[in-house]
Amino acid sequence: MTFFILFFIIFIPNSHVWAFDMDYDGHIATGSQYIFDSPPSHKDFDSELHVHLEFDGNILKKNELTLDYEIETALNLIDGPSVQSNLRPEEDIYLPRTWLRLSNDFFQFRVGRQEILFGDGVIFQPLGLFETRDVSGVVPESLGVDSFRATWFLSDVSLLETWLVPAKIGTALIPGIRADFLLGEFETGVVFQYHPKSDLEDFSGYEREMIQMGYHIKGEREVGFWNESRLDIEMEPSSPVQFDTVFGTDYTFEIGKGLHILMEYFLSTQQKEFSTSDLKGQRTYHHIGFSMDQPIDIEIKWQIYSLYDFLDKSFQIIPQIEYSITDDLFLYFHGKIGGDINGNKTNGRLYQRTNSFSGTESSIGLTVANYF
């Protein structure tokens, strides 16, 4: 990153270039949730304090070129069964994003810890190659990945983007490329990535060597609709494949201040030789997900997520009510209802109740968040 800064200082003319400034924002959130039927010798309450700070601004400006930056830092303090079961550390200080970007109207080059996110899936995201966000969480947060990314804006409706991500095993790199464009009236994108074995444990499939390719397409005809798919080809032992796809639709009904309903169907299937990470060793499974949200007035908004596994009959229902105390201070009432229609509580994909805390147990909680 130091080399990156020095390069642009040297090669961009110095007259009227320096334009360093800084802005900041962030939020503090604290809350606790009561775990129904917490595992034996585990605490009943899972509590968290989360502090998030973001600094951004410009470093250099020359004609149409801008060199800017963003630094995000976060602190988590956790207590409860998620710590006792080693799902989360008791204390965690980390940098979700730290990057430099050189850009103009036609291109941008960005280096550092950054988000690499694309695709149209909302609940299920086959193209979330570097996605860690829980969209049903109170304050969803996506971690960045250390990388170099270059984007060319070919027109107002099309772009070409490439990236390199250190795999953290020797000198191995994860290279990828994607293109977004309009296909008639449909927003369309394609992606290709080579994925060597890596130490990036925050992301799925890190232990496999794969070629990954996919597409997404989105349109609107009274209702919104989209499809997003990914094909993984494992390099060993005989190039077996895994295919993930999601079909989604949404519509806002003119009920009250607008009732938004979204539905997605997700299918994952793989050949026998593909390295499976499913707890049951099942090669094919499919989920359906719903979300509904509606503002009641300026101060109150409710939402609910519902997920169901057709194969093992497990489910999750995640309601939340947001109450705006002021423009910057919010109160969240949230819960989680997990279960299994077949009565199997030990190894569902969406619900598990065992002697160890899994994070899928039913709960009810309260969180306060202050944004600044």
Give a label for each model feature.
Residues 19-37, 67-69, 158:
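Transmembrane beta-strand segments of Gram-negative outer membrane beta-barrel proteins
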Residues 21-24, 60, 64-66, 105-106, ...:
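Signature for the C-terminal beta-barrel architecture of outer-membrane proteins
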Residues 30-36, 57-59, 71-79, 104-106, ...:
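Transmembrane beta-strands of outer-membrane beta-barrel pores
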Residues 31-49:
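Surface-exposed strand-loop-strand hairpins of Gram-negative outer-membrane beta-barrel proteins
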Residues 51-57, 97-104, 148-152, 177-181, ...:
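Residues on the lipid-exposed face of transmembrane beta-strands in outer-membrane beta-barrel proteins
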Residues 58-160, 181, 340:
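Outer membrane beta-barrel
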Residues 257-322:
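C-terminal structural cap/anchor segments
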Residues 323, 328-330, 335-337, 355-372:
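Outer-membrane beta-barrel "beta-signal"
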